[in-house]
């Protein structure tokens, strides 16, 4: 009787079987770089799924080529290429569309690359390294045009100014936050912090540097007055990632207390600047610097996590929209595409994934 019922099944309206999400993701690994549609049989499962919403060759693309943990990844502002770097000291440049070819490798650092950033027009790429330097690269030619030396220990973070003269701020294990003008050899300003600095960013107008580190506090330094303006407290463990929203009003922070927070960094904001707390992602004993990022329109945020999942939250409701599997190691950075609904993740499993999100 049961067998007969089973045979009748197909006459019912066809409802897609809910497959475990990890099967979907890992199935698509076959549809990664170099796999044409005819080879990617597991990927066909995804093709038959939800309608496509980006120009990626497949809904999920795997980028493999690094020889060590991948710590950072960023899309070029024009959205057609991306950069990744990590423990192997190399910066790899990739095409976003087509087969996602690794079309260039930038060599020059003698230590792990901890963070990468393009400047606003994408003409320059900045990289912070454990070799105590920050390198400035011409993103067209791949040539290193400048090396910023002055830190006495690992440089954990760098961030280029969004507008005005090309300034860059850096944070290091030597406990300092430095401001550089790339036309000059030495740092223009140095702010002394008691403990290691793990993450830095500018405010929107680039007259303040915001830093986070192992003292759990987020500090805002005024470049005109050359002093600490205010401190934002709330995290109960080291702050590992900072990201400013695209319109510059809000700051996102990721910390080892397993929370991601949003802070109001507008001038004259109320004294209690923490406006939202997000939970779900985790940090662990590996103590990797897990970063965080905003979607271009500010409606979503994403953060690295040590549990091998990519977390994406809705900014308004604070709900986890996506918990994406597929990686086999800590996810150290997640980046949103500037124009399309694509998310990029860099992991300790030496791989990067690009995937569509609705």
Swiss-Prot record:
Required for pre-mRNA splicing as component of the activated spliceosome. Component of the U5 small nuclear ribonucleoprotein (snRNP) complex and the U4/U6-U5 tri-snRNP complex, building blocks of the spliceosome. As a component of the minor spliceosome, involved in the splicing of U12-type introns in pre-mRNAs. The keyword Repeat applies. GO terms for biological process: mRNA processing; RNA splicing. The modification Asymmetric dimethylarginine is found at residue 21. There is a cross-link at residues 18, 271 (Glycyl lysine isopeptide (Lys-Gly) (interchain with G-Cter in SUMO2)). It comes from Mus musculus (Mouse). WD repeats lie at residues 65-104, 108-147, 150-190, 192-231, 234-273, 284-323, 326-358. Keywords: Isopeptide bond, Methylation, mRNA processing, mRNA splicing, Nucleus, Repeat, Spliceosome, Ubl conjugation, WD repeat. It is found in: Nucleus. Component of the pre-catalytic and catalytic spliceosome complexes. Component of the postcatalytic spliceosome P complex. Part of the U5 snRNP complex. Interacts with PRPF8. Component of the U4/U6-U5 tri-snRNP complex composed of the U4, U6 and U5 snRNAs and at least PRPF3, PRPF4, PRPF6, PRPF8, PRPF31, SNRNP200, TXNL4A, WDR57, SNRNP40, DDX23, CD2BP2, PPIH, SNU13, EFTUD2, SART1 and USP39. Component of the minor spliceosome, which splices U12-type introns. GO terms for cellular component: cytosol; nuclear speck; U2-type catalytic step 2 spliceosome; U4/U6 x U5 tri-snRNP complex. This is U5 small nuclear ribonucleoprotein 40 kDa protein. The keyword Ubl conjugation applies.
């Amino acid at each position: 009787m049961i067998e007969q019922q089973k045979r009748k099944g197909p006459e019912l309206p066809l409802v897609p079987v809910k497959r475990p999400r990890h099967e979907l993701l890992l199935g698509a690994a076959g549809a990664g770089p170099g796999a044409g549609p005819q080879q990617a049989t597991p990927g066909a499962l995804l093709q038959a799924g939800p309608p496509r919403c980006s120009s990626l060759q497949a809904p999920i693309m795997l980028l493999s080529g690094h020889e060590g943990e991948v710590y950072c990844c960023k899309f070029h502002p024009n959205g057609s290429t991306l950069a990744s770097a990590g423990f192997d000291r190399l910066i790899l440049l990739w095409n976003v569309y087509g087969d996602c070819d690794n079309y260039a490798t930038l060599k020059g650092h003698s230590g792990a690359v901890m963070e990468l950033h393009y400047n606003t027009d994408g003409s320059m790429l900045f990289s912070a390294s454990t070799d105590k330097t920050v390198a400035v690269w011409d993103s067209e030619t791949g040539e290193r045009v400048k090396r910023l030396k002055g830190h006495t220990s690992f440089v954990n973070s760098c961030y280029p100014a969004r507008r005005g003269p090309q300034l860059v701020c850096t944070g290091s294990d030597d406990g300092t936050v430095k401001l550089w003008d790339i036309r000059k050899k030495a740092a223009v300003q140095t702010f002394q912090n008691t403990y290691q600095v793990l993450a830095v960013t500018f405010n929107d107008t680039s007259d303040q540097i915001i830093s986070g580190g192992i003292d759990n506090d987020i500090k805002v330094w005024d470049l005109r007055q050359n002093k600490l303006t205010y401190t934002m407290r709330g995290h109960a463990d080291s702050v590992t990632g900072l990201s400013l929203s695209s319109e510059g009003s809000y700051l996102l922070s990721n910390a080892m207390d397993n929370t991601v927070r949003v802070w109001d960094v507008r001038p004259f904001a109320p004294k209690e600047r923490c406006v939202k707390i997000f939970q779900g992602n985790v940090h662990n004993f590996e103590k990797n610097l897990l970063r965080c990022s905003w979607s271009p329109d500010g409606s979503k945020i994403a953060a690295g996590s040590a549990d091998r999942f990519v977390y994406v939250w809705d900014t308004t409701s604070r709900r986890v929209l996506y918990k994406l599997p597929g990686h086999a190691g800590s996810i150290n950075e997640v980046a949103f595409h500037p124009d399309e609904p694509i998310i990029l993740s860099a992991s300790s499993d030496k791989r990067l994934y690009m995937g569509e999100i609705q």
